[in-house]
Design a protein with these regions (language model features):
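Two-component/phosphorelay signaling modules centered on CheY-like receiver
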Residues: 13-32
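Active-site beta3 strand of CheY-like receiver
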Residues: 47-53
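Conserved acidic carboxylate
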Residues: 10
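Conserved Asp/Asn-Gly motif in the active-site loop of CheY-like receiver
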Residues: 34-38, 93
């Protein structure tokens, strides 16, 4: 997975650091960060990542809207998106998949094996 570009979109600095730390332990990724959906859209327009970890509840623009807009962009359908949420409500996973997310994770992301499995499945290569 070396060289794969991953964008972590998370407004909570602690959650963002934990996920970035886990990703660095798994593989040699080019990791970028954003703190809201608007920043994520700007980064996707400039240089689309291979995969995005997208928090669903953020200020300025939430992950629901950012995912919808990414999917509407030219080439946006090739970016893999994993939805993240700390307050998993009934139906959130189904809604995330319906708006275009490829997978779903509850926060905090504490299981490195689960993250590795999702990366391998969505990026198509072994970590």
């Amino acid at each position: 997975m070396a060289g794969k570009k991953i964008l972590v979109v998370e407004d909570n600095e602690d959650n963002r650091r934990i996920l970035v730390y886990r990703l660095r332990k798994i593989g040699e990724f080019e990791i970028r960060e954003a703190t809201n959906g608007m920043e994520a859209l700007e980064q996707v327009r400039r240089d689309p990542p291979h995969l995005i970890f997208m928090d669903l509840k953020m200020p300025i623009m939430d992950g629901w809207e950012a995912t919808r807009r990414i999917r509407e962009m030219a080439g946006g359908d090739t970016v893999r998106i994993i939805a993240l949420t700390a307050q998993a409500m009934h139906g959130d996973e189904e809604k995330a998949l319906a708006i275009g997310c490829d997978d779903y994770l509850a926060k905090p992301v504490v299981d490195p094996a689960l993250v590795r499995e999702k990366l391998e499945r969505l990026l198509g290569v072994a970590a």
